[in-house]
UniProtKB/Swiss-Prot annotation:
Gene, per the UniProt record: rpsS
Protein name: Small ribosomal subunit protein uS19
Disordered as annotated region, ranges: 73-93
Cited InterPro entries: Ribosomal_uS19, Ribosomal_uS19_bac-type, Ribosomal_uS19_CS, Ribosomal_uS19_SF
Similarity-based family: Belongs to the universal ribosomal protein uS19 family.
Keywords: Ribonucleoprotein, Ribosomal protein, RNA-binding, rRNA-binding
Compositionally biased tracts (Basic and acidic residues): 83-93
Protein's organism: Streptomyces avermitilis (strain ATCC 31267 / DSM 46492 / JCM 5070 / NBRC 14893 / NCIMB 12804 / NRRL 8165 / MA-4680)
Keyword Magnesium on entry: no
Record's keyword annotation contains Ribosomal protein: yes
Molecular function terms, GO-annotated: rRNA binding; structural constituent of ribosome
A biological process from GO: translation
Length: 93
């Protein structure tokens, strides 16, 4: 179920402070965060945010189409290595 509109979007305080500080300074440095639950707001447009996936930080460049989504949606946590080919010769041995 989506979040209520009267509550507004959730963004961690430390993340919004970093974004606002960079907007005032006019810099576009990479912002490292562990907050996958934070929603992308219009103030983040044009910034690169490194989102933690449990192992490393994956850089995510925020575009206009991402507004309203959560940061964790753009940082996959699971790696798919593919299915093993069905090799009949190796099964006989």
């Amino acid at each position: 179920m989506p979040r209520s509109l009267k509550k507004g979007p959730f963004v961690d305080d430390h993340l919004i402070k970093k974004v606002d500080a960079q907007n005032e300074a006019g810099s576009k440095n990479v912002i490292k965060t562990w907050s996958r639950r934070s929603m992308i707001i219009p103030a983040m447009l044009g910034h690169t945010i490194a989102v933690h996936n449990g192992k490393t930080h994956i850089p995510v460049f925020v575009t206009e189409s991402m507004v309203g989504h959560k940061l964790g949606e753009f940082s996959p946590t699971r790696t798919f290595r593919g299915h093993v080919k069905d090799d009949r010769k190796s099964k006989r041995r």
